[in-house]
């Protein structure tokens, strides 16, 4: 399909309905059903291991091997379910999901079907524009991950590949799959999906149950999209597509937006939307057809015969609940009140994804406004240029130290930016950067000498200020700052000049 209708035109006649499946790899030491090291776990060295080295007979589905349940993975799943506002099941019951694919060595996946670990949850989602939606969560169930295929082609994709290799290091990694109920967010649907996944990432990081690196596949999202003609009955859900394995927040939003446009184009031209899986091509900004989407009965679920139901005591659930940190949504509300931020100010922090950094900077001694200024401004700008996370550039303690030096009059904003750059670029401490580049403000005696000289050499400008044209003071301030190499407080200089030239 070469051309699709615009997003605005698609929304005129159709209401988008989305459903989200978010797969979260748990960061346990070992896999879900075996003692093999977890490639998504806390040991960074695992990620650099060669293919098919983190496996056991259980991971490979060898005859005679039997699974045993990782209790820590169950605890992590319960904690995540509670954080999603879900009820927790009384028993842990596994089922076999039967299908054939090369990355599934047993030809079935141990998952859950009728009795998920957690169910009936809800998350509050707020978009950048301040619109609030409630995404209902149908279930969050525990399952094992599949292996990973490496397609040998110029693009790394299966299309045109001469052959594919299989790495079973990921096989058996514990997953929680979070399944939403249909979301009706109209034109905000792509944004709501992105913010929903972003909030889940924030939750799992606060709980410490996942590394939550989307680019490494620790969190993957499948986005179901269908369009309903406006005015059609609310109970009717048309054919849907499922765009698989979206692994960036940007891709989630763009893929859903494109799929809405693509389906609207098909329906408007009299064609049917095929119920299928699709794959997102980030480089082209389009989705491509995958395979016909299977219904649940085609997986022939049945109870896992090698794992008996495991009771989940209520006191265990309560103990996990009491051990959980403050929920990110509660944290947001508390910090907004403590910092006395307006809705716009706080949304700026959230949209820049630096809430944790601002909080830690404030706790290190900076003012909320000062911490926000640096993290949402200069640091975010540098991170955007370098395509990295702001948190990877500088510590909150260093930012707090810079802000404190500004408040003490040792640095001004211009010098502070130079200090910041040196700390980031050269891994210096704040004090090392100041000493290396002589970046502290000039002493007051030197400032006074420069001020006297500037006033005596600019009598015409001085007379303008005296006559009431106070905007001319900017010329005098600029001359002083130039003579001092920027090492002065411009606002204090301005006030000093006005106090000296104007009658009180």
From Swiss-Prot:
Name of this protein: Aspartyl/glutamyl-tRNA(Asn/Gln) amidotransferase subunit B
Function: Allows the formation of correctly charged Asn-tRNA(Asn) or Gln-tRNA(Gln) through the transamidation of misacylated Asp-tRNA(Asn) or Glu-tRNA(Gln) in organisms which lack either or both of asparaginyl-tRNA or glutaminyl-tRNA synthetases. The reaction takes place in the presence of glutamine and ATP through an activated phospho-Asp-tRNA(Asn) or phospho-Glu-tRNA(Gln).
Family that this chain belongs to: Belongs to the GatB/GatE family. GatB subfamily.
Native source organism of the sequence: Tropheryma whipplei (strain Twist) (Whipple's bacillus)
GO biological process, one term: glutaminyl-tRNAGln biosynthesis via transamidation
UniProt KW Protein biosynthesis keyword: yes
Family matches, as InterPro entries: Asn/Gln-tRNA_amidoTrfase_suB/E (IPR017959), Asn/Gln-tRNA_Trfase_suB/E_cat (IPR006075), Asn/Gln_amidotransferase (IPR018027), Asn/Gln_tRNA_amidoTrase-B-like (IPR003789), GatB (IPR004413), GatB_Yqey_C_2 (IPR023168), Gln-tRNA_amidoTrfase_suB_CS (IPR017958), Gln_synth/guanido_kin_cat_dom (IPR014746)
GO terms assigned for molecular function: asparaginyl-tRNA synthase (glutamine-hydrolyzing) activity; ATP binding; glutaminyl-tRNA synthase (glutamine-hydrolyzing) activity
Signal sequence range: none
Top EC category: ligase
Taxonomy, superkingdom: Bacteria
